[in-house]
Amino acid sequence: MSLNIETTQGLERRVAITVPTEIVSKAVREEFKRAAKNVRVDGFRKGHVPAHIIEQRFGASIRQDVLNDLLPRHFFNAVIAEKINIAGRPTFAIETFEEGKDLVFTATFEVYPEVKLQGLENIKVEKPTVEITEADIDKMIDVLRKQQATWAESQDVVKADDRVTIDFVGSVDGEEFEGGKATDFVLFMGQGRMIPGFEEGIVGHKAGEQFDIDVTFPAEYHAENLKGKAAKFAITLKKIENMVLPELTDEFVAKFGPNTKSVADLRAEIRKNMERELKNALVSRVKQQVINGLIEQNPIDVPVSAVEEEINVLRNQAAQRFGGNAQQTAQLPRELFEAEATRRVQVGLLFSEVIKSNELKADEERAKAMIADIASAYEQPAEVVEYYSKNEELMNNIRNVVLEEQAVDAVLAKAQVTEKVSSFDEIMNPQA
């Protein structure tokens, strides 16, 4: 077998491969022998069909089977011998496949780029340091109390955290518009569900009042005919309800688990959960900065085939998340996922090189600690640890996560790292 490799464009390669006629002829003979033992033809016993009948009826399909075997086998033998790191599947083109002649074909495929890391010392990472305060815990308790809140009808004016029941009719230039009318609409004030100015126009009014609100639809509003338009809403305020928060008693805190018997227990449990969430958020924030720095310092081309595979993964994930079927998934435009898919392939290649160049292997003790941390969120942590330890697929997933963390640490060791004091809210609610 001889071959010739050429670069067509970017990461695309074309290999011309010649398979000697002796190998081809032998493969064809062996396939005919196998067929002769197994084919069934009316009028002949199995294994006794004449060769010319087999040739007439099955010759073309037998040769196609031989071709289907020879092409990938000799292609992969060639790329292994040449140590070519292929991406995706090759496309074959037959140049010669005739009796008594060499098999000549080409394979077009992509290769993964050669990655040589550089500029790690130029990567800048801001590492937040956060202390969870008693005030942070108080805020979390307030959230829990609001989740358990009841509502009491009020005759006072509307305040920012009330619940109101209203009728409204919206109009633009005196004409009502589709979707601008509702009856007995329940609105939780202060949540920003309505367009700017709507909630603010209700604050200060009393139940039973009728009044108008003048607002302007945002320029980016989803309805094309309303973008940037001035509108008037006629409001009938039917009912106002004040939020009534439950008292912080032992009875209240008992709702949050069998081991939570007092306010002190609840605060301790909240702190533990906040610490776990904070730790994960900090790891994620630092990792994203490392990823951004790696990509910025090491711009690389990625194989189209690898990106397409990742697009399919993202499509399927989107379908699972939103309940779509396979047909609907296939119709989702690739442009929705292309940027993220490209980034994922880049990150995978760069992290692989970090792991390779630093000769990293997953730290088993670190993996055990990660499982213990995951298990701590469950009521029976020992059972969770045992479940992980007996499931090799889950263990490998954990090892891969640990290996990525070790790769991040390896980059941080060379990067410019600065610490910044931050609050819990700044890390957990960066958009707030």
UniProtKB/Swiss-Prot annotation:
Record's protein name: Trigger factor
Cellular localization per UniProt: Cytoplasm
Ranges of residues in domain PPIase FKBP-type: 161-246
UniProt-listed Pfam families: FKBP_C, Trigger_C, Trigger_N
GO biological process: 'de novo' cotranslational protein folding; cell division; chaperone-mediated protein folding; protein transport; protein unfolding
Protein's organism: Haemophilus influenzae (strain ATCC 51907 / DSM 11121 / KW20 / Rd)
Written domain comment of the UniProt record: Consists of 3 domains; the N-terminus binds the ribosome, the middle domain has PPIase activity, while the C-terminus has intrinsic chaperone activity on its own.
Catalytic activity: [protein]-peptidylproline (omega=180) = [protein]-peptidylproline (omega=0)
Domain of life: Bacteria
Encoding gene (name): tig
Gene Ontology cellular component list: cytoplasm
PANTHER family assigned: TRIGGER FACTOR CHAPERONE AND PEPTIDYL-PROLYL CIS/TRANS ISOMERASE, TRIGGER FACTOR-LIKE PROTEIN TIG, CHLOROPLASTIC
One function term, GO molecular function aspect: protein folding chaperone
Record-stated family: Belongs to the FKBP-type PPIase family. Tig subfamily.
EC number: 5.2.1.8
Key words of the record: Cell cycle, Cell division, Chaperone, Cytoplasm, Isomerase, Rotamase
Gene3D superfamilies, per the entry: 3.10.50.40, Trigger factor ribosome-binding domain, Trigger factor, C-terminal domain
Role description: Involved in protein export. Acts as a chaperone by maintaining the newly synthesized protein in an open conformation. Functions as a peptidyl-prolyl cis-trans isomerase.
Entry keyword Amino-acid biosynthesis: no
